[in-house]
């Protein structure tokens, strides 16, 4: 790997006991999968399984989940095999809640986001009597408990606080309601909690319990990128879509490489890096509809936290390349701050990071939800949707610095375009930006 490679930093990471770096065969294996050299990829995956481990160092753990995803990528084009491998898998609400809790506890990213979001709400709603927060993924009570405690001390008394929490998991909303109403009762705080059981893309903004006079704040933490998921076939003309169906019917007459190549071509059509495609116009109808619906609420504040990576429209090999860079930093920060024997760490890596990696590599079209984009792309998208940026609080930045230092000196943040980027060893991982209705 030359010094210009995005992987030069991996040389500093620990190798396994045999001195082998599993990153190298993984990258080669990914190229084989993308080109359709399945037998070679199979040999590579066999070798990788011998030098990687979900219980090893950070690189070994990450490579384990990337190699697993590559394996699923291969078998997904054999529908019967793929369904058989996944037929017994059950997603429990309790597991989802638990792994989010691990992410909150072991890494500072969610705490950072919540701190900055709450400070922005406090400052923008300073004189409002009725504050209505719409949480697009209501799952962590600590954020709003902290806000309730702070607003209770507001000079002149607290506002009437409404929180409309959106989550497709009923259990998550029930837990949120219990914790928030309990805290409000203890503090004698005026609170109304409105649970909305819904997928993000199905939220009916017109029927949300927003009343005239409500000062609206919207909080979106790692949610909006899922709305970038689109049907790749729909981007092509209807004639092309029909032709693809005819070609699919003759799969036996085509090579596996050709079949994979179709995925890569479709992905390129949607690429925000492509000169053939505007940044997002037409690429994601769901995103455009959703942003327009939010704008109609005329929010006084909209705070967005997103992954700082570019994994939306690129082809398979570029996607893997960029995902290795992003997730390499996440696994490294866990390796540096959490013991290898931690059960919580193992579950976080397997149930959250591993599943995200699998979605990025294995899935295409509407099934690929992990379509991260960089801050500059979100800025352009939000501006075009009719929002203007709100500078983030100085007080919030001071508190955020103290928060990050409690985890590790390698955590830091930097300012960019009136937004904040939280970093690990100078590598931006998440962005936080604040907006308002124009």
UniProtKB/Swiss-Prot annotation:
Q: Name one GO molecular function term.
A: DNA-binding transcription factor activity
Q: What are the start and end residues of every segment in region (PFYRE)? A: 216-359
Q: Name one GO cellular component term.
A: nucleus
Q: Where does the GRAS domain start and stop, copy by copy?
A: 13-436
Per UniProt, the keywords (alphabetical) are: Nucleus, Transcription, Transcription regulation
Which branch of life, at top level? Eukaryota
Expression induction or repression: Accumulates in roots, in a RAM1-dependent manner, during colonization by arbuscular mycorrhizal fungi (e.g. Glomus versiforme).
Its quaternary structure?
Answer: Interacts with RAM1.
Query: Which PANTHER family is this protein grouped with?
Result: OSJNBA0084A10.13 PROTEIN-RELATED
Tell me what this protein is called: GRAS family protein TF80
Name the source organism: Medicago truncatula
Task: Point out the gene that encodes the protein.
Answer: TF80
């Amino acid at each position: 790997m030359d010094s210009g490679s995005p992987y030069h930093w991996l040389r500093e990471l620990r190798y396994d006991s045999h001195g082998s770096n599993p990153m190298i065969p993984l990258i080669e294996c990914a190229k084989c999968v993308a080109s359709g050299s399945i037998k070679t990829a199979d040999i590579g995956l066999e070798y990788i399984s011998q030098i990687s481990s979900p219980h090893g160092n950070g690189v070994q753990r990450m490579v384990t989940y990337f190699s697993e995803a590559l394996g699923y990528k291969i078998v997904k084009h054999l529908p019967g095999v793929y369904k058989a491998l996944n037929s017994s898998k059950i997603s429990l609400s309790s597991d989802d809640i638990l792994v989010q809790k691990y992410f909150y506890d072991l890494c500072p990213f969610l705490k950072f986001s919540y701190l900055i979001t709450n400070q922005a709400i406090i400052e923008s709603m300073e004189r409002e009597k009725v504050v209505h927060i719409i949480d697009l993924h209501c799952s962590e009570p600590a954020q709003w408990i902290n806000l309730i405690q702070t607003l209770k001390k507001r000079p002149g008394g607290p506002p009437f606080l409404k929180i409309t929490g959106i989550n497709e998991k009923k259990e998550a909303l029930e837990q949120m309601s219990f914790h928030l109403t309990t805290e409000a009762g203890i503090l004698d705080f005026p609170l109304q909690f409105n649970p909305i059981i819904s997928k993000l893309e199905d939220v009916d903004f017109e029927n949300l319990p927003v009343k005239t006079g409500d000062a609206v704040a919207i909080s979106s933490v790692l949610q909006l990128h899922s709305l970038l998921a689109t049907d790749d076939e729909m981007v092509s003309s209807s004639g092309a879509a029909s032709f693809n169906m005819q070609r699919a019917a003759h799969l036996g007459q085509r090579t596996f490489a050709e079949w994979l190549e179709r995925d890569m071509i479709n992905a390129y059509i949607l690429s925000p890096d492509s000169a053939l495609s505007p940044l997002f116009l037409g690429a994601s109808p769901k995103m455009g509809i959703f942003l327009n619906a939010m704008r109609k609420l005329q929010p006084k504040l909209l705070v967005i936290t997103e992954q700082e990576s570019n994994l939306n429209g690129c082809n398979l090999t570029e996607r893997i390349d960029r995902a290795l860079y992003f997730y390499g930093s996440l696994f490294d920060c866990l390796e540096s701050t959490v013991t290898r024997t931690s059960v919580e760490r193992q579950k976080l890596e397997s149930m959250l990071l591993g599943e995200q990696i699998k979605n990025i590599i294995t899935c295409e079209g509407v099934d690929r939800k992990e379509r991260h984009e960089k801050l500059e792309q979100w800025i352009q998208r939000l501006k075009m949707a009719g929002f203007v940026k709100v500078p983030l609080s100085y007080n919030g930045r001071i508190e955020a610095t103290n928060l990050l230092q409690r985890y590790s000196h390698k955590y830091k943040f930097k300012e960019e375009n009136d937004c904040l980027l939280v970093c690990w060893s100078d590598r931006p991982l998440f962005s936080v930006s604040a907006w308002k209705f124009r």
